[in-house]
Amino acid sequence: MKKKSSDFCLCNERKSQLSKFLENLSIDFSNFDLLNTALCHSSYSNELDQKSSNNERLEFLGDSVLNLIITDHLYKTYPNKSEGELSKARSYIVSEDSLSNIAREINLGSYILLGRGEESNDGRNKKGILADAIEAFVGAIYLDSGFSRATEFVVGLFDMYIRLMFNRGDFKDYKSLLQEYVQKKYKISPSYKLDKEIGPDHDKVFCVELYVGENFISNGKGKSKKEAEMRAAEVALKAMENINL
């Protein structure tokens, strides 16, 4: 049965869902209709015969805003890096793999409106849909709150990944690579468990364990939980082919 056009309206239940999403990210948003559009995939709007009421235009805008923010941040934060290094870093950061991983970190997929076909085909976990949605979300933040607020949001999400890249000397997103490998081979997702925290609050080290199903695979340490998870994923990915689960 075809959806009614009224299904696209921002009902109280949907607004409550979006409010929870924003609360988790500590973001204020004025225009909830704009936010709702940013999280509406074309498969959903097509079922309503409202083909323009989806996130494609916001994705177009957000792509440019995101690139400018990342370029500006890299240029100002890493004055000793060459143009080639900065270009390589930017390409990695705004890649589909990196954007989809960031989207998973903030649970963005749970709030995307999808058509029945994409819903049944696990669209919430598709890298392309997630990457497009986070670009549209950045575009919506820019329109709603301005460039400064969009910059604060983007840098807050990506800064840890950028620092890890330069510290390691490579540009691989091990969490995304591991996620893809495990899902393809075992049809499940890896999980991360905080094992312990070491040291005082001003110099804390987080220790994380990585599991595939019930099987312990690796651990990692870092100055943040995300950094520890990335390091655990790096160890796991390099060892995975030698592990018989």
Swiss-Prot record:
The entry's function note states: Digests double-stranded RNA. Involved in the processing of primary rRNA transcript to yield the immediate precursors to the large and small rRNAs (23S and 16S). Processes some mRNAs, and tRNAs when they are encoded in the rRNA operon. Processes pre-crRNA and tracrRNA of type II CRISPR loci if present in the organism.
Q: Which Pfam families match?
A: dsrm (PF00035), Ribonucleas_3_3 (PF14622)
Give the InterPro entries listed for this entry. dsRBD_dom (IPR014720), RNase_III (IPR011907), RNase_III_dom (IPR000999), RNase_III_sf (IPR036389)
What EC number(s) does this enzyme carry? Answer: 3.1.26.3
Might you name a Gene Ontology BP term for this protein?
Answer: mRNA processing
Q: What class of enzyme is it?
A: hydrolase
UniProt name for this protein = Ribonuclease 3
Q: Which NCBIfam families does the entry link to?
A: RNaseIII
Molecular function terms from GO: double-stranded RNA binding; metal ion binding; ribonuclease III activity; rRNA binding
Chain positions recorded as Mg(2+) binding sites: 59, 132, 135
The UniProt record lists the keyword RNA-binding: yes
